[in-house]
């Protein structure tokens, strides 16, 4: 079994390539599992959020929130997070109706910038 140094180098090279291929396969499989787990966790959190909102909002308030979500998705997300926080902390006793939702939206509404234009 006397192999020449060239044969040994060639065998080493083949073995290194096999090991690299195995490592690449494991990494891609691990990243797929991680992405799937993150997606499942995100969906679970969204389902919990929707359940809390359904529990604490009347139909009118939910319709108002959905209308805002269509026009201003970022603002609607901020409102939803605030409502979930209030519900989880126990600061919402009854269901929020449309009038209370209007008040909450007024409080959370970003300050509008006003510009004064002076003519000279």
Curated annotation (Swiss-Prot):
Q: Enumerate the residue ranges of region (Disordered).
A: 1-55
Composition-biased stretches, type Basic and acidic residues, lie in 10-23
**An example Gene Ontology molecular-function term:** DNA binding
Superkingdom of this protein's organism = Archaea
Descriptive protein name: DNA-binding protein HQ_1105A
Q: Which cellular components does GO assign to this protein?
A: cytosol
Q: Which UniProt keywords apply?
A: DNA-binding
Q: Which family does it belong to?
A: Belongs to the PDCD5 family.
Which residue stretches does the UniProt record annotate as biased composition, category Polar residues?
Answer: 24-34
What is the organism field in this record? Answer: Haloquadratum walsbyi (strain DSM 16790 / HBSQ001)
